[in-house]
Regions:
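Extracytoplasmic
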Residues: 1-28, 251-256
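Structural signature of the two symmetry-related core transmembrane helices
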Residues: 60-74, 305-323
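Conserved MFS/SLC helix-loop-helix module at the cytosolic interface between two early adjacent transmembrane helices
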Residues: 44-83
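Cytoplasmic helix-loop-helix junction between adjacent transmembrane helices
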Residues: 88-127
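Juxtamembrane intracellular "pre-TM" segments in multi-pass secondary transporters
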Residues: 197-239, 262-265, 343-346, 457-467
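Residue-level signature of mid-helix packing/kink "hotspots" within the transmembrane helices
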Residues: 11, 39-47, 131-132, 281-289, ...
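Helix-loop-helix hairpin linking two adjacent transmembrane segments in secondary transporters
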Residues: 123-194
Length: 469
């Protein structure tokens, strides 16, 4: 529960970016820098906490994270300047940086190796639901009527909101205050209730040996392990591919301003509900479950690199669907599509809107199918004492890609006044580049899986000897 509240941090901030910009008299170039810096700091502390996760009790890291985050967001109430928000967001980034390695490490030690992709998919669903709740919760305090603001550029709309809605600008702080107090209470409770699972107890070759409560997995990460991690080529290709997340980082950062300022509709509009419905059906069901289950099944049938193959296929198939969706560029204020080139009536708008939502939903499904299989592959390709660290390294590189998307996107949107064009070209360029780093995994993973499995078999024999003693 505590982890779910902490990971709500960004989903609370992103829906109310327009309010934040209007409140603090800034524009999307400053917002982009803020989101980018947050992502980088978050990534740095993911690496630090990944190492700490492999070395110390994860319960302690979770509690520290809870206290830092809750104290930080409660003090958002007193922010009046951009620099204050910047510092506070960096502290929040530190706190959220602890959650990824702790979560992945917990799941790896609580769920059978054969079903890891499915377990990560379930966690993805739970965290997605938490994010949606956080966004809806944040938007419930935002009463700006975006549909009434038409015929203005993005920056002019922000100025209009600042001038005409002065009594509503502070409301972006309220959801943070309420969730911060809740997190503070839950963190205190977790000191007494959280249980630490046994490391390695769900691995295929260690499960039997570690079923004895007297036998513990005593291997700990050493600093010298880091140079050995990347002797396995699969780790290199799985972790350095930041191109894969540049476009998604941009989309995630600006999805709400894109809907409110460029498409020109309120987030609670029926058309947005249709969009979310398609994204939920295709993205969560097909992406998080069907594709994750497919990866698990391939491994269970003896294809040790099956999850990697599914991730590669997803990375390729996501491109055409997202490119078609963002090329449609709907605008509800003047009933047009394709960058104002095609004007339609109300019926035509709904038909094309559903087509747009379908392409976007299928594209998101393949995008979301990558995550569970990627995490599972990283876990399977590394020893239990190294998993938190390798996931942290991969997440840090991801954060670089996402921050690039947010920062570049902020400046490009500020210059071009177009979210659609910015997202379209970033998806095309960085999507093609990422494919070149996915394909080599077809050839590197079988050898690396065999290497790890042989080590775990040997350790299993050693642990069985401990049981006899």
């Amino acid at each position: 529960m505590l982890i779910l509240i902490i990971i709500m941090d960004n989903p609370i901030f992103l829906p109310n970016q327009v309010l934040v910009a209007a409140d603090l008299k800034i524009y999307f170039d400053s917002i982009g820098l803020l989101i980018g810096a947050y992502t980088i700091i978050n990534g740095i502390f993911i690496i630090i906490s990944g190492y700490l996760t492999d070395k110390y009790e994860r319960k302690l890291l979770l509690i520290v994270s809870g206290f830092i985050w809750s104290a930080t967001v409660i003090f958002y109430l007193f922010i009046t300047q951009y620099w204050q928000l910047f510092l506070e967001r960096m502290l929040a980034a530190i706190a959220t940086g602890f959650t990824t390695p702790v979560t992945i490490s917990y799941i790896a030690d609580m769920v059978s190796q054969k079903s890891r992709s499915k377990s990560f998919a379930i966690w993805g669903l739970i965290s997605a639901v938490a994010s949606v709740f956080a966004s809806i919760f944040a938007l419930s305090f935002n009463t700006i009527d975006f549909e009434s603001i038409s015929g203005l550029s993005i920056n002019e709309k922000i100025n209009y909101i600042r001038t005409n809605f002065p009594n509503q600008l502070y409301t972006w702080k309220l959801p943070y205050l309420l969730l911060g107090i809740t997190a503070l209470i839950i963190t205190t409770i977790n000191i007494f209730l959280t249980v630490e699972p046994k490391r390695g107890s769900k691995d295929l070759y260690l499960k039997e040996s570690l079923s004895d409560e007297m036998v513990k997995y005593t291997y700990k990460i050493r600093l010298s392990d880091f140079k050995n991690l990347f002797k396995r080529k699969s780790n290199i290709f799985l972790t350095i591919n930041f191109f894969d997340v540049v476009a998604s980082g941009l989309l995630l950062a600006y999805i709400f301003p894109y809907i409110e300022l460029e498409i020109g509709i309120n987030v609670i509009d029926a058309r947005v509900l249709v969009l979310l419905l398609f994204a939920g059906i295709f993205g969560l069901f097909l992406g998080q479950f069907i594709l994750a289950h497919w990866g698990d099944k391939k491994v269970q049938k003896g294809d040790v690199s099956g999850r990697v193959k599914v991730a590669v296929i997803c990375s390729i198939l996501t491109l055409p669907f997202l490119l078609i969706a963002f090329s449609m560029s709907p605008n509800a204020t003047n009933d047009t599509f394709f960058f104002n080139a095609v004007k339609v009536n109300d019926v035509g708008f709904w038909i094309l809107w559903i087509v747009y939502c379908s392409f976007l939903g299928i594209g998101l499904a393949f995008t979301m199918g990558i995550g569970p299989n990627w995490y599972s592959s990283l876990i399977d390709l590394n020893l239990p004492e190294n998993r938190g660290s390798i996931v942290a390294i991969g997440s840090f590189v991801d954060s670089i890609g996402r921050s690039m998307g947010a920062i570049m996107g902020g400046f490009i949107v500020h210059a071009t006044q177009s979210f659609s064009a910015t997202i379209f070209w970033s998806t095309l360029i960085f999507g093609i580049l990422s494919i070149f780093l996915w394909v080599p995994l077809f050839y590197t993973t079988p050898k690396d899986f065999e290497y790890i499995h042989n080590i775990l078999k040997e350790r299993s024999l050693n642990l069985k000897e401990q049981r006899k003693d």
